[in-house]
């Protein structure tokens, strides 16, 4: 008997009935920039699901719309404690996962491709991996376009001016092709963090306090 993940994800997705489409505006914060994986690297469960969704959206000619919804859903997960707890709930059976995920996707107004894809994820009891799968889709897209993926974390949502200034500073540092993801993190207290690969740029108040505490311990 094949396991829950031994399936052609693209063919399974295509058998689901379509639903209505819509967009969700995303406003997130906190900066982490990570080097994208090699395009040819498809190891791991999340990467396989990510590739299936990316290829399906490309074949159907609505990749741009799907990527926008992927970013919006990833942002919603990052910003909602309740949503993260729901996705991580191992007690939920397949029927419950499918029902609640359908309600969630309808409420957020996503299109049929992403909605059916999340349905497959729920059917296979892989909702705890959803955030990683969405990250994989965005990383794959950035890799194909020769970009570096930047995840931004800040205590407050970035303004358009702050976002433009950050992109300019990253370009000055040699990162001219950067795709940013943004998340809010109140624990930073103020400022932001930016990670590029193994390099962390930390201007947050929390980071400054930590460095001060470490310096005081070293001087003791």
From Swiss-Prot:
Pfam families: OSCP. It comes from the Bacteria. SUPFAM superfamilies: N-terminal domain of the delta subunit of the F1F0-ATP synthase (SSF47928). Keywords: ATP synthesis, Cell inner membrane, Cell membrane, CF(1), Hydrogen ion transport, Ion transport, Membrane, Transport. The keyword Cell inner membrane applies. Its main location: membrane. The keyword Acyltransferase does not apply. It is found in: Cell inner membrane. InterPro entries: ATP_synth_OSCP/delta_N_sf, ATPase_OSCP/d_CS, ATPase_OSCP/dsu. Belongs to the ATPase delta chain family. F(1)F(0) ATP synthase produces ATP from ADP in the presence of a proton or sodium gradient. F-type ATPases consist of two structural domains, F(1) containing the extramembraneous catalytic core and F(0) containing the membrane proton channel, linked together by a central stalk and a peripheral stalk. During catalysis, ATP synthesis in the catalytic domain of F(1) is coupled via a rotary mechanism of the central stalk subunits to proton translocation. This protein is part of the stalk that links CF(0) to CF(1). It either transmits conformational changes from CF(0) to CF(1) or is implicated in proton conduction. HAMAP family: ATP_synth_delta_bact. This is ATP synthase subunit delta. The gene is atpH.
